[in-house]
């Protein structure tokens, strides 16, 4: 119910079924679609000379299959777009491929029709239980040590893409099954430190987690940072594509929508505003939200290829 009216939405149920009407979903979504200031200007930045990506799945276990599967889908998409493993840092639990419940041992499949193996030729830099949130901070700040041999090798001429998939709670992102949490203040401080250290030209973070907006909202004012979340600060994000053979969900609604948009469009014509709008309209059960545009620039004239395609 909103503005005194009831709206019925398409929703992916926990059993994998879709109910209700597309028109109802559209009516509901229209109430919450963001408007963007078309007069915003970008900071006077040096030309982009390269780009890097950090991909993190912050859960483990078979019931959380979707988080690692989604991160691997992003990983394979970036590899297709010219990224090498030297350009990528991949962090995940890596406990799915040989799980006894896996119907395709040695593989991670997110599309139960094409059966594409997302685990093929994957280079995992850190397993989730090997590092802590403090280690993650050092990785993103480029501070290597005996434990952390792979860190973000970027400077203020590089665009950085951060892809994150896991669980969240109000005000926090959960880190591994020990329920360690990463707060909005932690992320804000980290991004500010990265900017001060010259670790990025622009940073685009895409976060799939419940209540992710409550963390992103704390990052307001960080220079040249843009965050897109699967859910706003008051709601959960939704699993999607339940597969009986796997007895779990293979993906999340937001990431399904995001990758469908990315794989169906020309990256060089797709603005971040277009990416937001299309992903928003396809994501059921939560509201995709952008944060910190005022400190980032004009989303109508910043393009997806600047982050997802290798320079």
Residue ranges and their predicted role:
Residues 1-311:
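Cysteine endopeptidase catalytic domains of the caspase/legumain-like
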């Amino acid at each position: 119910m909103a503005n005194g009216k009831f709206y019925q939405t398409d929703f992916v149920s926990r059993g994998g079924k879709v109910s209700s009407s597309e028109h109802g979903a559209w009516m509901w979504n229209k109430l919450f679609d963001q408007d963007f200031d078309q007069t915003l200007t970008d900071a006077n930045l040096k030309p982009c000379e390269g780009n890097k990506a950090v991909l993190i799945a912050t859960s483990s276990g078979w019931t959380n299959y979707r988080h690692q599967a989604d991160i691997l889908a992003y990983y394979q998409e970036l590899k297709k777009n010219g990224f090498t493993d030297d350009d990528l840092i991949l962090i995940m639990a890596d406990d799915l491929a040989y799980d006894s419940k896996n119907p395709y041992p040695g593989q991670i499949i997110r599309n139960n029709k094409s059966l594409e193996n997302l685990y093929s030729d994957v280079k995992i830099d850190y397993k989730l239980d090997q590092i802590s949130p403090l280690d993650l901070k050092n990785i993103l700040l480029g501070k290597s040590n005996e434990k952390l041999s792979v860190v973000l090798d970027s400077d203020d001429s590089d665009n950085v893409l951060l892809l994150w998939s896991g669980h969240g709670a109000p005000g926090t992102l959960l880190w591994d099954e020990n329920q360690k949490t990463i707060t909005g203040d932690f992320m804000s401080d980290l991004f500010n430190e990265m900017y001060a250290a010259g670790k990025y030209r622009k940073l685009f973070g895409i976060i799939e987690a419940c209540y992710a907006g409550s963390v992103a909202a704390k990052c307001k004012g960080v220079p040249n940072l843009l965050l897109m979340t699967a859910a706003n600060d008051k709601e959960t994000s939704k699993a999607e594509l339940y597969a009986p053979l796997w007895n779990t969900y293979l993906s999340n609604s937001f990431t399904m929508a995001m990758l469908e948009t990315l794989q169906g469009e020309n990256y060089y014509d797709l603005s971040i505003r277009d990416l937001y709008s299309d992903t928003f309209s396809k994501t059921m059960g939560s509201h995709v939200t952008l944060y910190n545009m005022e400190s980032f620039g004009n989303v109508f004239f910043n393009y997806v290829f600047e982050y997802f395609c290798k320079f």
